[in-house]
Curated annotation (Swiss-Prot):
Pfam family name, one: GidB
Protein name: Ribosomal RNA small subunit methyltransferase G
Domain of life: Bacteria
GO cellular component: cytosol
EC number: 2.1.1.-
Keyword rRNA processing assigned: yes
Matching PANTHER family: S-ADENOSYL-L-METHIONINE-DEPENDENT METHYLTRANSFERASES SUPERFAMILY PROTEIN
Length: 239
């Protein structure tokens, strides 16, 4: 099946419509991703069909959350090659997007993608979540934080919840073992000012891959001691 139809049919299966211009933007993104991937390690997924499903449809599946709206400010924490932030920006062009990554080479790649796709209101930050989450320019400034499964949930919430303003949401993509992770992370979520408001299982179109979508609402401010200094959240997660 050609890539264009995977995107169109896949989005329809996930419950929303993607237009031809958005499809073209994502296909351009795929071309740049695979070209840059020959020079640096951006993704282990290089088969075109797999890029469509495991990167693009996977990222866009966040739209299934009832809490994600088409406008507002969003930070993608540890965005890597731009997932899920850039596909969400393509779908919701009014989102003001910040892409945070600790590797400068990846940030340069993200700048090129955004320029080639004609994306506006995209901000690029080279840094670590633990440090940026303590800076006034980023702390509790965003309606949404998003992240793919870059760490266990009790670590991830310390990276991400400090960025979210009270009344905003952390939208997190995790593997299928979500209930157990939530149980192990309940105290961390509460301490950091969050409350679980949505969880759902999603099977990606054209695959047997099932993952979980978790939404945590920020209901009170994060105590100033969080996030702790770089490396501490992963070495000593909040119990």
């Amino acid at each position: 099946m050609e890539s264009k139809m995977i995107l169109k049919d896949g989005c329809q299966e996930l419950g929303f419509h993607i237009d031809d211009n958005q499809v073209q933007q994502l296909l351009t993104y795929k071309d740049i991703l695979l070209e840059w991937n020959e020079k640096m390690n951006l993704t282990a997924i290089t088969e075109e069909e797999e890029v469509m499903v495991k990167h693009f449809l996977d990222s866009l599946s966040c739209i299934q959350s009832q809490y994600l709206k088409e406008e507002g400010t969003m930070i993608d924490v540890g965005t890597g090659a731009g997932f899920p932030g850039i596909p969400l920006k393509v779908y919701f062009p009014k989102l003001k997007l910040t892409l945070l990554d600790s590797l400068n080479k990846r940030v340069e790649f993200l700048k090129e993608v955004s320029q080639e796709l004609g994306l506006e209101d995209v901000n690029f930050v080279h840094g670590r979540a633990e440090e940026c989450g303590q800076e006034e320019t980023h702390r509790e400034q965003y309606d949404y934080a998003v992240a793919r499964a870059v760490a266990s949930l009790n670590v991830l919430v310390e990276y991400c919840l400090p960025f979210v303003k009270v009344g905003g949401y952390f939208i997190c993509q995790k593997g299928p073992q979500l209930k157990e992770e939530i149980q192990n992370s309940q105290n961390a979520i509460t301490v950091l000012g969050g409350k679980v408001v949505e969880q759902k299982e999603i099977t990606l179109p054209f695959s047997d891959i099932t993952h979980s979508l978790l939404v945590i609402e920020k209901i009170k401010q994060t105590p100033t001691k969080y996030p702790r200094k770089p490396g501490t959240p992963s070495k000593k997660p909040i119990k």
